[in-house]
Structure formats: C-alpha cells, structure tokens
C-alpha cells in the first residue's frame, strides 16, 4: 500500500486519490495487467463481473463516527472492494479498509451510497482476459458509449427524483464529459440548491470545470474557497482557485495557488501546465 501511495499520494494527509490516478498506476507500473473504469454501473453488472471471477472496486459513501468541525454532516467517500455476492440474501461481500474484511452489504444500501459517485467502478485483470471483460461490459465497453448511457440514466433519475442532489450532480458530471459546460453548470446549480454534502468537492471536480468553461468565474472562486475550507490541502481546489484568480487578473495569487498545488502533489500535471502557462505569458 505504501509503495503505491508514495507515487499517487505522496502527502500522507491527502484525503483523496482519484480513480484515474489509480488506473494510471496500473497502466504504468503493472504492465502484465489491464484496468477498466466506467460510470453508470448497476447491481446486475457488478454481479456479472463477480460471477466471472473479477473483483470490482467502487467509490461510494462513507459516514464518519465523529465530527471534524461544528455541524459536520459526517459524509465522506471511500473505495470499497467487492469480492462476492449472495442473491438469496441480496448482499455483496465487501472488503472495507475502514471497518474490516468480508462484510455483507445489501444491494439496495450499496446502490444508494454508490449513486453519489456516478456509480463508478474499476476492475484490474490479466491481459488475456480482456475478451471476457469486453463481453461482460458489452455496450459499455466504449468509454464514450458508456458515458452516453450514464448521461441518459442521470437525465431519467433527475426527472424521476427532482429532489435528489446526486441525480443532478451526476447529470452535470456526465455533461462535463461531453463538454456541455453550460448545461453542466445548470445541473450543478440545481444540485447546489438542493444541498450537496460538505466534502463533495474533495472527491469530484466537475463543478470547477463547468463554471470555468462557462465563464462563471465568481462561482468558481466561491466553490474553490469553500472546498479549501473543508479540505485545505486539496490540490484540485487550489488549482481551480488559481485559475479563478487568473481570470480575475490576480496573476501573483494564481501562481501561488498553482505552486502550492504542485508542492502538495509533486508531479501534478495540471499544476505544471498552469505554471508553464503563466511563464509563457
């Protein structure tokens, strides 16, 4: 674990590792393995992958036992490894790094917590098993097709559950993938109005992209400031606060944020790009 974290999480108090960072580690450090991660998963798909012998990792909701600040909503996210299922009991067997091994989790409860993260899932498998994985994923094998399916599902869920902040957040996240930034910003507006969890921007950064690319710099700055109140060492929030400062004409403040993001995460490609961008002006 520490061998991996030294590369993708060099600061031990970093509260988040993105799933694409995990995927990059597999691709660059474990050449005998392949990985896939998709969004918009389902209970049936998880069962199919497990039945074929593939453990599946998902990102889902976790609640802390104690508060870290006044009026802490205790909501957080973490990765959960699924290693089996029991249709009779309607449960998955899960490996939970916070609680312990081989814990049952009901299908319904898992799906409710999984929705908050766009039902993302990841699997790692030997190269020779790629045809089987491709067959199981079927229409979701193509990342673009998968995102379109997730976008359609989020549209349906936000229409059927208009008070569900995660349905709107997922809609925005999938719109960002297709660079519909104005539409995504509107979806995130709805999610904000309904009230997303206090730590949401520790794990997901679609609102930053949506507000930046739709020209809503004041909203971008406000969100980045809020995210840093909750997670002061978030390199992603520092990066986007830096871009907000840049848009507002505060180049020195932008440079300081980009440098701090890089200091927190050495090699952070987006921070390196931002610093190079400022240097080229």
Where in the sequence are the language-model features?
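Alpha-helical adaptor scaffolds
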Residues: 172-182, 189-243
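Cysteine-nucleophile protease catalytic domains, especially the papain-like/related folds used
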Residues: 1-45, 51-52, 117-141, 174, ...
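Noncatalytic regulatory segments and standalone regulatory/sensor domains
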Residues: 69, 73-74, 83-176, 183
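Register position in tetratricopeptide repeats
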Residues: 177, 213, 247, 277-281
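Terminal, low-structured helical/coil segments at or just beyond the last alpha-helical repeat
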Residues: 255-281
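Active-site-adjacent substructure of cysteine-protease-like catalytic cores
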Residues: 41-95
């Amino acid at each position: 674990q520490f061998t991996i974290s030294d590369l993708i999480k060099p600061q031990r108090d970093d509260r988040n590792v993105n799933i694409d960072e995990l995927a990059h580690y597999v691709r660059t450090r474990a050449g005998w393995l392949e990985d896939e991660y998709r969004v918009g998963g389902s209970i049936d798909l998880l069962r199919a992958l497990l039945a074929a012998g593939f453990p599946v990792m998902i990102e889902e909701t976790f609640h802390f036992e104690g508060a870290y600040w006044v009026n802490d909503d205790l909501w957080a996210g973490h990765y959960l490894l699924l290693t089996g299922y029991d249709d009779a009991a309607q449960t998955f067997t899960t490996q939970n790094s916070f609680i312990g091994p081989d814990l049952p989790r009901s299908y319904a409860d898992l799906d409710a917590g999984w929705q908050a993260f766009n039902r993302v899932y990841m699997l790692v498998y030997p190269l020779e098993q790629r045809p089987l994985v491709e067959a199981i994923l079927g229409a979701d094998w193509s990342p673009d097709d998968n995102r379109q399916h997730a976008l359609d599902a989020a549209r349906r869920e936000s229409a059927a559950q208009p008070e569900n902040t995660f349905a709107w957040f997922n809609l925005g996240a999938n719109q960002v993938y297709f660079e519909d930034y104005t539409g995504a910003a509107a979806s995130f507006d709805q999610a904000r109005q309904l009230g997303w969890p206090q730590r949401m921007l520790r794990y997901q950064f679609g609102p930053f992209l949506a507000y930046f690319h739709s020209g809503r710099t004041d909203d971008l700055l406000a969100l980045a400031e809020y995210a840093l109140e909750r997670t002061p060492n978030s390199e992603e929030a520092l990066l986007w606060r830096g871009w907000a400062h840049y848009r507002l004409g505060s180049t020195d403040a932008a440079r300081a944020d980009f440098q701090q993001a890089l200091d927190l995460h050495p090699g952070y490609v987006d921070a390196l790009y931002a610093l190079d961008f400022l240097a080229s002006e």
